[in-house]
Amino acid sequence: PPEDELRKFIGPPLQEQFMKCCEIEEKEAAEMVGLYREYYQEKGIFDNWVYEGVMEMLKTLKEAGLTIVMATSKPEKFAKMIAEHFGFAKYFDLIGGACMNGARTKKQEVIQYVLGQCEEKDLEKIRMVGDRCYDIEGANREGIRAIGVLYGYERRTGGSGS
């Protein structure tokens, strides 16, 4: 499929996106997610990169004494492997992601999980940085200020998801 079609699968829960885009039932979508994850774990997991300036930013924030956590829609297991592989896990106090069993798949659920694990409870001191509309919407639903970035997959839509 064309790249713009594949981009629709980045961000939202995969099973929901398969059902929507492929017009299939839940069971078939779950099977497709399983097949995708098999491929991803073997071949696709490290087929990405760290954007320029991100490592330096993480280092600066960590040296300033900030607590840095990750809330990703990617399965937590994969997120931790990627963070280790690319050398930025050391900057994070917590890496939280989706559950492989489907119990925590929506961005808001991941954010709730991460917030529950954080020592900081004052939402005024917490910021969500994201490159997809799902990041911004999830943060807004939890009462967290969000910072949208344009270097990721959302491109120049301003986080609208359009």
Feature names for model-found ranges:
Residues 1-55, 77:
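N-terminal helical cap/lid subdomain that shapes the substrate entry/recognition surface
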Residues 55-63, 115, 136-140:
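Surface-exposed amphipathic alpha-helices with a cationic face
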Residues 127-162:
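Acidic, Mg2+-coordinating phosphoryl-transfer loop and its flanking beta/alpha structural elements
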Residues 57-83:
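Substrate-recognition element of Asp-dependent hydrolases with the DxDx(T/V) motif
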Residues 34, 89-104:
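A short, structured active-site edge motif that brings together acidic residues
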Residues 106-136:
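Conserved Lys-Pro-Asp/Glu-containing loop-to-beta segment of HAD-superfamily phosphomonoesterases
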Residues 86-96, 157-162:
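Structural recognition of alpha->loop->beta junctions
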Residues 1-5, 26-28, 90-94, 122-126:
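Short acidic capping loops at alpha-helix termini that bridge into adjacent secondary structure
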